[in-house]
Regions:
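C-terminal terminal-subdomain/extension
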Residues: 1-49, 57-58, 66-69, 119-253
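Short, surface-exposed secondary-structure edge patches
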Residues: 62-67, 83, 97
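A residue-level detector for short acidic-glycine micro-motifs
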Residues: 94-96, 110, 208
Length: 253
């Protein structure tokens, strides 16, 4: 239960909290270490995003999103976290078997990319090597979307060229379609660059299983978004289940 403070007391508390945060960010900015200065940028981005999430909270309806199924890969904003907690925009796998469309939260396991120095045969407890499965699933989905999109762009360009020659005054009607295509192509390019990091394989961080607000979901939000229906195989999900049982229960496997 919150304290019963006056407006002036709340303002003083706010100013004290903001001053403390500003002092911390300034200390990061003034560091001679490039990596530490980078934290200032990431934290500032997160404060902006977090404020947006909080402002949107009262208007958010989980029913406006698609229904998420067990095994689906989603991209979420885990935030700016402490220590070794996973944070930032992250791919995760849904581990709930019956998440209601109206539920405001969902339970996920974060995924991370295999690094060149990673020894996938000797991972820490709570980590499961998934091989290239997430990468191949994402590449297949992107390729599936890219082909019809490129055809749409080709057909649209022909129509634009024909209209420009005969009725240049009607060119404005293509504006939205052109903007949509440009946005979708840019998104696909970014996704390709992003998932290339997972070429060496992916690891499920079962030890960092977490329940998040669906406000944090970046993609997919609808059945037509890039990540919709990209799933892990039942074999990989069974391995994640076994690790959850081993790590968080007294059941013998």
């Amino acid at each position: 239960m919150g304290r019963n403070l006056t407006k002036e007391e709340l303002k003083r508390h706010k100013e004290k909290a903001l001053a403390k945060m500003e002092h911390y960010i300034d200390s990061l900015i003034n560091s001679p270490v490039s990596k530490t200065r980078g934290k200032a940028d990431k934290l500032s981005y997160w404060l902006e995003d977090w404020s947006t999430f909080l402002d949107f909270e009262s208007r958010f309806s989980p029913s406006s999103l698609r229904r998420y199924k067990r095994g689906e890969i989603i991209k979420v904003h885990l935030g700016y976290n402490i220590g070794s907690e996973e944070g930032g925009l992250h791919y995760c796998v849904v581990v709930e078997k019956n998440n209601s469309k109206s539920s405001p939260v969902i339970t996920v396991v974060p995924l991370t990319s295999v690094k060149k120095k990673s020894d996938v045969d000797h991972l820490h407890k709570g980590c499961i090597y998934l091989g290239n499965e997430p990468y191949t699933g994402l590449v297949s989905k992107i390729t599936y979307i890219q082909r019809p999109l490129e055809k749409k762009v080709f057909d649209l360009k022909k129509e634009v060229d024909a209209t420009y020659k005969t009725h240049p005054e009607d060119m404005h009607k293509f504006q939205k379609d052109l903007e949509d295509c440009a946005r979708d192509l840019l998104l696909l390019k970014r996704m390709r660059n992003e998932i290339n990091k997972a070429k060496l394989g992916s690891i499920a961080l079962v030890g960092q299983i977490t329940t998040i607000s669906k406000i944090r979901i970046y993609d997919p939000k609808t059945n037509f978004d890039i990540l919709s229906n990209v799933k892990l195989s039942n074999e990989k999900l069974d391995r994640i289940d076994q690790e959850i049982i081993s790590n968080f229960t007294n059941r013998k496997i």
